[in-house]
C-alpha cells in the first residue's frame, strides 16, 4: 500500500496520519497513539529492521492490512538514540487535542524533528564529543563549508580551496549530519559518510542566505563577522541555518554569530596526518592509546570537547599560546583544588543550549543552580593567581547571584524528570499553586477518614478506598461481603475477587481533587515557562561564562598533566628550527612497561633533513611521531614531553607513515603512499614539518630507491622543509655528502649471535648495517628459514657488489629510466617464479630466458 493512495478510501485516523506523513516523506514518523508511538506502512517495515522491533498489522484501511510497529512513549529516547547513531532522522507527532472534546481523530501535529546533527537532548548526545551539523557547497572557485554545534551555538564557516583541504576539514570536524546540494559533483568525497542529506539548490541561494543570517543575528550586514565576501561559505551557512529552523521549530537565541576559520591561523594537517598521529582516534577506529586518551583528564564534558577541538586545530598565534602557557604555569599549584568545584559545574554549555531551545528539563535547571553555587569557590581560588589570562577568564566567569536565588526559590531540591510529572516548582514560590496543591494533597487525609468511617458504619472489614488512572477513586469490597453494601453504592468495576463502587460524596471529592491536580499542573507549567523567560535575557553572559569555565577546565587539566607526566614549558621562537632535548612520545611512554628512552632532535636552516636509519622495531617511527606530537602540543599552548624544547614557526605538519590498501576505493598500498607523497611535494613549504617513513617500499627495489632518492632531494633542495626521512635504503645515507642541510642519524641496536637488543637511542651518523634477519628471528620465524635467508643474503651481496645500487651517483639519477643491472634483473625474475606451477616445457623456456638476461 502506498502512502499517497486516495485519502477518501482510508479511515479518518489514517487520513490524518497520511497527511502528516506527506509533509515528512523522507524520515520516520512516530505517531502518538495513547501510550505508544506507532509507525505505519514503509516506516513500520524500516523501523522494525533498524530498531529490531516487531512488525505487526493493524486492522485494515482502504481494504488492506496496515503494517505497523510501535514503541512505548516512555522509552522513545532510547530508540531515537539508536536511530541517530545510524544516521537516521525522525519526526515526533504528538496528540495536542483533548480526546474528551474531539470529534473524530484527536488533533495531532509534529512537534519536533530529531536528526543526527540537530540533537540537543543529553540522552542522545555523546557527552565528551562535539555533535556537528554541516553543509557543503562547491563550484569552480572551490568549496564552501559551514558547521554548527546546536548544543553550544558554535557556528563556523570555511572556504577550503581544493579537494584535499576539504577532505581534511571533513575528517577534522567529522559531522554527524551533512547537507549537500543535489548537483554536488565530487560524491566520492562524502558518499561513505553517515547522515547525508541531499538538499535542493535553492536552499543554497546567496541572497537568501545573507538575509537569513542577518535576521538570525539581528544585523544589517555580515561585515562585522568578516564573512561578507565569503560567498561560497555563506551559501553553505544559509542552507544549514534554514535546515535547523525547519527541524527545531523554535527560535535559536543561542546562535549569535558566525566565525570564519582561516587556514593560515592554524597549523594545517591533512586527513592522512590526523589519522597517522592518532590524536583522538587510533588506527583501529577506537579511542584507546590516543593523544586525547593520555591528555584528557578534564572534569567537565564541555572542557573535554574544547580540548579535542584544540587538538584538531593547533594555532599559530604566539600571543594566545603564551597566554595559555602562563595560565598553565599559574594553575599548577592549585589544579587539583580547582578541579573540585569545576567538576560540579557539569555541562553548563549544553544546558544553556536546551534553555535557548526551551527544551531544558527540570533537572537541567537544578544542575544550572548547582553550577552557580560553585562560582564563589572558583573566584576564591583564582583571585590570587597573578596571571592576566586567568584573571580575564575569571571576569568572564562572572557571578549570577540573582539567577541562583531565583532557581533556589523556584525549583525543588531534587526535581522529577519532566514538568508534566508535577512537583517541580518549590513550595512558597507561588501562593496560588500552593493553594491548589493543598487541596490535592489533602486527599490522603480525607480518604483515610472516609475509609475508617464507612468500614465502621457498615461493619465491612474488607472495605478500602483506592485510586487508579482509568476509573478514578473507588471503594473496594471483597466479593464475599459485596451483598452487604447499601443501595447508594454504585458499582464502578468488577474484579475476580472484589467489587469496586463509587458514592456521590467520593465522586464530588474526586472531581475536586482531579480539578485541583490539573489546575496545579497547569499553573506549574506556566511558572516553568516564566522561569525560562527570566533566564533567557542573560543568555549571552551565561554562554560567555560557560566558555570561560570550559577553558579553565582545559588549562587546569593541562597543568595537572604537566605536573603528573613531567612535561616542560616549550619556548616558542620566531627563528626557524626545532630543538628538543630529551624528547619523549606522550602515548608510548605511558603504555610501555619499561622506561622510555628519551632522545634529542635538532632541525635548523643548516640542518633541514635527518636521514634516519636503523633496525625495524628500533624506534624510527616513534622518534618521528613524537617530534610531530611535541610540535603539535606546543601549538596548543600545552607543556610538552621533553626536558627542553624550542619550536620555531610551523605552518603545516605532514606525515607519510605506513599505509594499508584502500580497498573501498580500489587503491593499492603503493598508490595510497604515492598519493600522500604527491600531496606533500605539492603543498609543503620551508616552514613545514614533514615525516617520511620508508617511502618507496611498495614497489620493486630500484623503483622504490629512485623515488625515495628523488623525494628526499626535492624536499631538501627545492622545498627546504624540515624533514625527518626514515628509510631502509642505505644508499640514501650518501645524500649528506652531495647536499647541504642533510644529516644522517640512526637508532642504535646491539647484535649478539642471533639475538638483538634495541637501544632506542638516536645517534649521529648512518647505521652500520641492517638488522632485518635478527628482527625476523625475534619475531619467531623458524630457524631453518633464517639460516637459508643468511645464505641467500651472502649470495645476493656477492652478486650485487658490482651493481649500481651501491655506487649510485644521486645527482645523475632519474626517476623513470634507471638501468637495472642484468644479474639483479635475472635474480628478481627467478625469485618471482613458482617452480611447482611450471610444466617441463615452460621450465626449459625459463632457463633459456634467464641465460639471455645475464
Swiss-Prot record:
CDD domains: ABC_MutS1. GO terms for molecular function: ATP binding; ATP-dependent DNA damage sensor activity; damaged DNA binding; mismatched DNA binding. The keyword DNA repair applies. This protein is involved in the repair of mismatches in DNA. It is possible that it carries out the mismatch recognition step. This protein has a weak ATPase activity. Coiled coil: none annotated. The keyword Transit peptide does not apply. One of its GO terms (cellular component) is cytosol. GO terms for biological process: mismatch repair. It comes from Yersinia pestis bv. Antiqua (strain Antiqua). ATP binds at residues 614-621. Belongs to the DNA mismatch repair MutS family. The gene is mutS. InterPro entries: DNA_mismatch_repair_MutS, DNA_mismatch_repair_MutS-lik_N, DNA_mismatch_repair_MutS/MSH, DNA_mismatch_repair_MutS_C, DNA_mismatch_repair_MutS_clamp, DNA_mismatch_repair_MutS_core, DNA_mismatch_repair_MutS_N, DNA_mismatch_repair_MutS_sf. It comes from the Bacteria. This is DNA mismatch repair protein MutS. Keywords: ATP-binding, DNA damage, DNA repair, DNA-binding, Nucleotide-binding.
